[in-house]
Amino acid sequence: MIGLLKEYSDCFAWNYTEMPGLSREIVEHRLPIKSGFRPFKQRARTFRPDLLPRIKDEIHRLLEADFIRPCRYAEWVSNIVPVEKKESGKLRVCIDFCNLNRATPKDEYPMPIADTLINNASGNRIISFLDGNAGYNQIFMAEEDASKTAFICPGFIGLFE
């Protein structure tokens, strides 16, 4: 496996800046809001003080890669949820879009259930998994919907979309 990774290393992104994203002419993600839903701003959460510098570093990496941008005003505001990886201790900054998710229509074609996929793979000698870390950053958000993805960061880091 290591040999394959080395041989095809140019096929993988090893940091955020190596992920240029798809062209807007090919695909853009839109966030329609169901009727009857009003914009919602979550109250800012507090975090352990030792996490704040690591959150700030991750936000700066996302800014440098142009995955996010500062936002001056947004009607929809969500909180970040910092998640520490058990094995590596690496911090992943997730966003709590629970209010926005309730307001958007459900997909007509939902993702398959993980257990079903694993059961269907039984009998094979090798099963591999890929971590799609930051994969959602590869599809641009339609400009008119970008502010709906706004999130607030603790410690006066700011508001981003």
Task: Give the predicted meaning of each segment.
Residues 1-161:
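Retroelement reverse transcriptase polymerase core
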